[in-house]
């Protein structure tokens, strides 16, 4: 958006929550058109890994957060919008998980505000961070967040160096071949 403010470009296109967050931060931007549906963002694990249960647990907790309004609170905290997404679940929402290990390593990308970014106190924060922390608490497991960058986060999960990824990752057919969402 710096190119826009200096006049180097006349318009920019980005994900709606990214622009809404920039507006909320005081940037002189506006949204002047209807957006295009480009898919959805998701939490993922390596297909065939022993941590595929994390997707089910994530979705169960997400459904409960949708039901109790806490998902809406997180989204509104970081953007000006609300969500109408309906997570799918395979078991009852709110059912506690039985962790397979004491701590799960979740890889992310800290350069994608408002989803994940470093604040002025050098703390990782944003929609994805609030979401994964709330889900870990709801499901009764510990997490360790790493922020190696988007491509490195994908590689870390594929190599088994991280158990899952939450990094504003869009769900595509190609990614479905490698990841479960």
For every predicted segment, state its role.
Residues 16, 20-60, 110:
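Periplasmic-binding protein-like
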Residues 4-5, 43, 58, 135, ...:
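Hydrophobic residues within well-ordered alpha-helices
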Residues 83-124, 137:
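Immediate post-signal peptide segment of exported/extracytoplasmic ligand-binding proteins
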Residues 124-134:
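Short catalytic helix/loop segments, enriched in acidic residues and glycine
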Residues 10-11, 30, 42, 105, ...:
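Short, Asp-centered acidic motifs that coordinate Mg2+ and/or phosphate
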Residues 28-37, 48, 129, 137, ...:
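Acidic, polar ligand-binding/catalytic clefts
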Residues 26-33, 59-100:
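Ligand-binding clefts/hinges and TM-proximal coupling segments of bilobed small-molecule sensing domains
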């Amino acid at each position: 958006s710096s190119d826009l403010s200096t006049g180097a470009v006349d318009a920019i296109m980005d994900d709606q929550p990214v622009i809404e967050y920039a507006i909320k931060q005081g940037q002189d931007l506006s949204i002047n058109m209807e957006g295009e549906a480009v898919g959805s963002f998701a939490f993922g694990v390596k297909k065939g890994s022993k941590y595929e249960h994390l997707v089910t647990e994530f979705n169960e907790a997400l459904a409960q957060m949708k039901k109790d309004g806490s998902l809406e609170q997180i989204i509104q905290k970081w953007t000006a919008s609300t969500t109408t997404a309906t997570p799918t679940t395979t078991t009852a929402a709110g059912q506690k998980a039985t962790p397979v290990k004491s701590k799960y390593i979740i890889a992310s990308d800290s350069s994608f505000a408002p989803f994940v970014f470093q604040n002025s106190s050098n703390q990782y924060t944003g929609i994805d961070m609030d979401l994964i922390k709330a889900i870990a608490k709801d499901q009764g497991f510990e997490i360790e967040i790493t922020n190696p960058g988007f491509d490195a986060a994908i590689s870390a999960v594929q190599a088994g160096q991280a158990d899952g990824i939450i990094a504003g990752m869009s769900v595509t057919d190609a990614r479905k071949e490698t990841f479960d969402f």
